[in-house]
């Protein structure tokens, strides 16, 4: 698939010295600036060694992030008012209140267990090394990873949004978490069995995707061409699997608000800062552990000094280490979800009771102020 490297269109994501020597020499002759990139990458030509690639990515994604941040501020502007949350009044909260919340708020305790294990194993699932091994070694076609990401992203988001809108509204957030969790477990088992019985073992001819790019309309017509059966089934399985399991990871943020309301119901104290800080800390901690978990898995199959890359030949050890990180470890996280949700007290009915009680407390506070 074409990649721009120092203003030259390189016909493949990575050109290797062994297989593409003449092609590399021709490109260097056209643009001598490529010579330094070839030297740094050991005779190969890869977009990863091109500073211009990362400059472009920084500007593009930084700009998009800024636009979306402004959109979020505009959307929340009118609702970001104390009368819509907590008790509608300012309260003094001390260290003793935080300690009591952590010690006795069963809802936040269980949600932290659920969210941390979910985050850890979702991070191993999407780790860069795991994707390199899955697409570059097992499928033998790392260039297909870009098409895979763009083809699956929108359907996964749509499925997640539709399910969340339907299930969370009718059954409550705890039920949504469990639906996403069991969907993730079932999907993981299905993908494991599929890859076990239809393992390409590095044969790129068995795994091919269209050269589709969301930002390039000229490629949209290729979406329905260039598929192999293995690739098509895998992509459909991943879309269904990821769309359903996204419920469990996406619903966590709104469940923290329920935990804050539960604390108001339990003690009369509103401590949203504690909830946000706790989740931010857990998120950063477990995200940093994901790379260590992945490294441990691959070290068990012989990669103690360096992790596999796209030039590493296929082996059964790599297959099982990748399957472990991609689908089996997430099952462990989802089983932790099931256990945590068993002890999570905030059902849909309980939240209705809590909201009624908070409404009563607010009314009493307003009457006193009047």
What are these model-predicted stretches?
Residues 167-170, 201, 207-209, 277-308, ...:
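Intrinsically disordered cytosolic tails
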């Amino acid at each position: 698939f074409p990649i721009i490297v120092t203003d030259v269109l390189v016909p493949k994501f990575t050109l290797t010295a062994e297989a593409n020597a003449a092609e590399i020499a021709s490109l260097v002759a056209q643009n001598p600036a490529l010579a330094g990139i070839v030297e740094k990458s050991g005779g190969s030509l890869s977009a990863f060694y091109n500073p211009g690639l990362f400059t472009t990515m920084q500007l593009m994604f930084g700009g998009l992030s800024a636009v979306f941040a402004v959109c979020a501020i505009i959307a929340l502007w009118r609702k970001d008012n104390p009368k819509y949350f907590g008790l509608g009044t300012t309260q003094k909260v001390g260290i003793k209140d935080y300690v009591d919340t952590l010690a006795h708020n069963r809802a936040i305790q269980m949600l932290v267990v659920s969210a941390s294990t979910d985050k850890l194993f979702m991070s191993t699932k999407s780790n860069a090394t795991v994707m390199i091994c899955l697409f570059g070694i097992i499928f033998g076609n790392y260039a297909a990873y870009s098409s895979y990401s763009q083809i699956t992203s929108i359907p996964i988001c749509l499925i997640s949004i539709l399910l969340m809108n339907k299930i969370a509204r009718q059954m409550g957030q705890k039920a949504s978490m469990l639906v996403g969790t069991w969907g993730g477990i079932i999907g993981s088992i299905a993908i494991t069995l599929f890859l076990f019985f239809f393992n390409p073992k590095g044969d790129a001819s068995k795994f091919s995707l269209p050269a589709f790019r969301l930002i390039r309309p000229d490629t949209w017509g290729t979406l329905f061409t260039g598929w192999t059966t293995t690739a098509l089934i895998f992509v459909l399985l991943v879309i269904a699997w990821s769309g359903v399991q996204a419920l469990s990871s996406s619903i966590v943020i709104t469940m923290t608000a329920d935990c804050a309301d539960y604390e108001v119901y339990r003690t009369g104290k509103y401590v949203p800062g504690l909830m946000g800080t706790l989740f931010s800390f857990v998120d950063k901690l477990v995200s940093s552990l994901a790379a260590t978990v992945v490294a441990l898995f691959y070290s068990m199959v012989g990669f103690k000094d360096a992790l596999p890359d796209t030039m590493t030949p296929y082996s059964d050890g790599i297959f099982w280490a990748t399957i472990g990180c991609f689908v089996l470890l997430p099952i462990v996280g989802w089983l932790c979800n099931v256990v945590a949700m068993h002890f999570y007290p905030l059902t849909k009915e309980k939240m209705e009771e809590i909201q009624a009680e908070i409404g009563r407390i607010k009314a009493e506070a307003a009457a006193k102020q009047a």
